[in-house]
Amino acid sequence: HAEEFFIGPMLTLIPPTACLFEICFAKPSFAHVGTGFHEIAARRSDYALAAAAAHIEADDTGAVQDLRLAIGGVSDFPQRLPLDIHIDVSGDKADTDTRLTTAIDAALDSVDFVEDMHATASYRRRVAAELARRAVDDALCEIAQDLP
């Protein structure tokens, strides 16, 4: 679990002389999978000031069965956001967007945003919210294209 793997900013449980060779992911449980990732950095290939990744699984009707959203670059650790929302890929987009924005904003309340010479905490929060919405939207669009 990521919560146990990261022990500090830029630090993991892996000793300095060790090398990570493999990461295993669970096989998706549902027929349709969508992913999205967005980040922002001061320069190309710099560490992210904020990043968001989404992984969504839906059944054959387009009902989302699993939505995972994580953010990074905004606090000491990358973290998964606890989202409490029901989404149907074929549902009303405006309604979905509104409910998603509300759910993401509520989930971000639990994050301790860092402030440093690169960005303020409030900037990181605003950007993380937008990147999270974009990542989820990309994942939903990917699923929508896959549905019959």
Question: Where is each model-derived feature located?
Answer:
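C-terminal structural segment of proteins
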Residues: 1-148
